[in-house]
């Protein structure tokens, strides 16, 4: 896949999630995942698990897979370099989601440089 895209002059930015892996880590640490209206309620402890999974395990595994397929890449998170700016999710009915938010601005310069 990477060689096909490369031959066409394409540059790719891969954005990933990791819900199942986050749930698995939380379960291993004895914390139950809580979902409200389909969104994971994210308190401080859950946010730490999210960061470990997304910024650590999955990020590095994806970069390794890309490299092994003949591509090259670097793993960054949306928090790095202010890539994304977000505001806390404000549900009109007052539902509290913890650290869940909406991205309001993207600063792509970090990936363009």
Go through each PLM region and give its residues.
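Nucleotide/pyrophosphate-binding catalytic subdomain
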Residues: 1-113
């Amino acid at each position: 896949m990477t060689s096909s895209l490369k031959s066409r002059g394409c540059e790719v930015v891969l954005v990933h999630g990791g819900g199942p892996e986050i749930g698995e880590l939380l379960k291993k640490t004895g914390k139950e995942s809580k979902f409200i209206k389909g969104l994971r309620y994210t308190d401080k402890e859950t946010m730490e698990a999210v960061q470990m999974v997304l910024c650590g395990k999955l990020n590095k595994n994806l970069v390794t897979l890309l490299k092994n397929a003949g591509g090259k890449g670097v793993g960054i998170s949306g928090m790095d370099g202010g890539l994304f700016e977000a505001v806390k999710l404000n549900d009109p009915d007052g539902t509290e989601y913890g650290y869940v938010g909406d991205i309001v601005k993207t600063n792509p310069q970090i990936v363009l440089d």
